[in-house]
Amino acid sequence: MLFFRASTDGTATDATAALENLYAGNDPTACWLVGSGPSILGAPVEQIAASPVVKIGVNFSGRGPDGTAPRITPDIWTSFDPTSRFHRSIFLNPRITKFLKADKQKDLIPGTTFKACDCPATYFFRSETRGYGDFLDSRSDRILNALDSFIQALDIGYRLGFRRFFCVGADFIIRPSDAQVSLAVSCGIDFDETSGVLVTKDADPKLHYRSDRLVDFVDECIRKFGGKDRRAVIEELESAGREQQYSFSETKPLAAAIHADSHYWERVQYLRLARRNLSLRGVSLVSCSPGSRLNDWFSFREPLTVCDEMTAACGDPREERTVGRYSGDVRDAVRESLPHHRDVSPYDWAQTVSRRAKSDLDSAPT
């Protein structure tokens, strides 16, 4: 039982048959996988929201600053994080299909007396850890657990039938602020906007290297800030001016941001090491997030170009005409392609159906 509905009495109703490969079609089905990195603030969100494909969201993806409407409202949503972190406008919205871990089915929804299993369009799943060789596995009855909402969403999307994932707002990096960089440079730290800080922890200059990891930036500051301890350096960096961590109104303490950035870096390595598995499963992961760590290992596409291609593939209602659809001969709409359509049965199909029917009859209980 991969996906199921749940009740407050603990009973479960299998929904796998209705959901697995629901979105698969004659061509590899595309979707937007929406994150909450700062890059989404510069993305063409109106065109993305209007594009004719499903938007899969994680956590607070698509949210802007407090007091503003969501920039993108997801069609499908999931999160690895605690239920209490998120708003009821996600859980109680029947337009958003939610996928939650099985242990969250009786969590209370913030601001309500409802449990997660009471919410509309909400499904649950059990999870498991897997290696890179079976990173995505259609034979499993569980979703991949990598302690990460993005990877969880990727596996859910795969089981729903999506094969092309266009990732927007998926930065997978927390960069130091301009003020923090200026402070570091004034203390003799070598920082490059593209490749990050020059790490000099080894005395041999030949072993120095560039790193875009926030932990390396802070550690280098500790080495160069005149003998100050780690706590004092972090406080000084925080007071200089905070880094932009998300597209929405929230900023973690710098110590927590360091941990989050290391998590992002590691999960990108997971995806890099799983590329052959993704290829074998027919999955294409495409970054549409400028400056994302994904861009080192996966192809990058401009989101507007992707929007245009999606619209061209699905059809543009703005260019379609309804005149004549009731008053004319609608067969004209397909007549040109009819000469190329000749449906045929599979080889020896009548005998195959007969054999299957006999086999089912023979195996039926008496």
Annotate the PLM regions:
Residues 1-366:
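Metal-ion/cofactor- or nucleotide/acyl-coenzyme-handling active-site neighborhoods
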